[in-house]
């Protein structure tokens, strides 16, 4: 999925670099003086001070972003302080504790709630001059888009097809900031399955009202990961006007409305195209 500038926003004070021992997989320390430099096109540059490694010692850098606005369970004194309490824990133990909440009737709004993201660097030593590393960041949520006839719109003699409301049914209310599902080496695939192990979910609905969509509604609907079983499956109720009538139809998370359901997987976009009525 392509990322818009708004989706890729990272700000100082809400990005964290964890230095993980490459052998033991335990957290050694956090980079405390982290700075974000945004003057590099579509890249984000993070600068900070690291401790030199000794001999053959290697570390990996875990980058976590946009946690403050996402109601991380168990956090009361701020994320940096919370993460510092986990020095000595394994990366997996830390990941299991980083659960964001998405509750209430209000849909996700990027102006008020940045998207939680995670990435990890290759193993490296830290020379006196410091390492220069790259990593890709993966969003902890999936994205849903609705197109009308391939974003060309639909018309008849009585006017345009207009989407006036969307209800997301049975969305999960939380998710892990970091997935422990296997990350594919193929960047076009990324994650292939959701990771929701151990989470107790409460299904909920989100309502988008007052819409006037004739071409596309995209980059606005975000969902936690979900094993999309027949019992309580996520779906979209789309209310529209066309041909002088107002109707509501349900869109299932299936290819062409039939077959097996799509699971909801982070960092993927699910595009549903309304091509005919």
Task: Label each PLM-derived region with a short phrase.
Residues 2-83, 124-128, 143-266:
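Tryptophan-paired
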Residues 81-143, 147-151, 256-277:
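Extracellular beta-sheet/turn segments enriched in Thr/Pro/Gly and aliphatic residues
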């Amino acid at each position: 999925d392509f990322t818009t500038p708004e989706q890729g926003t990272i700000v100082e004070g809400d990005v964290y670099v964890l230095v993980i021992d490459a052998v033991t997989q335990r957290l050694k320390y956090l980079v405390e003086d982290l700075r974000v430099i945004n003057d590099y096109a579509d890249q984000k540059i993070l600068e900070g001070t690291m401790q030199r490694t000794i001999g053959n010692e290697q570390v990996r850098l875990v980058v976590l972003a946009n946690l403050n606005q996402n109601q991380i369970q168990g956090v009361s004194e701020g994320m940096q302080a919370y993460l510092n309490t986990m020095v000595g824990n394994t990366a997996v133990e830390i990941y299991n504790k980083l659960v964001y909440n998405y509750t209430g009737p209000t849909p996700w709004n990027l102006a008020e709630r940045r998207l939680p993201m995670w990435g990890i660097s290759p193993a490296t030593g830290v020379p006196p001059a410091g390492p220069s590393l790259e990593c890709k960041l993966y969003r902890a949520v999936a994205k849903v888009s609705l197109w009308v006839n391939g974003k060309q719109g639909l018309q008849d003699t009585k006017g345009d097809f207009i989407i006036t409301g969307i209800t997301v049914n049975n969305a999960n209310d939380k998710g892990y900031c970091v997935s422990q599902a296997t990350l594919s080496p193929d960047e076009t695939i990324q994650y292939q399955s959701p990771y929701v192990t151990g989470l107790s979910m409460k299904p909920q609905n989100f309502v988008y009202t007052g819409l006037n969509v004739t071409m596309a509604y995209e980059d606005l609907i975000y969902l936690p990961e979900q094993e999309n079983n027949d019992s309580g499956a996520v779906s979209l109720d789309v209310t529209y006007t066309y041909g002088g009538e107002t109707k509501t139809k349900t869109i299932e998370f299936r290819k062409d409305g039939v077959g097996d359901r799509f699971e909801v997987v982070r960092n993927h976009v699910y595009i549903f195209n309304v091509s005919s009525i």
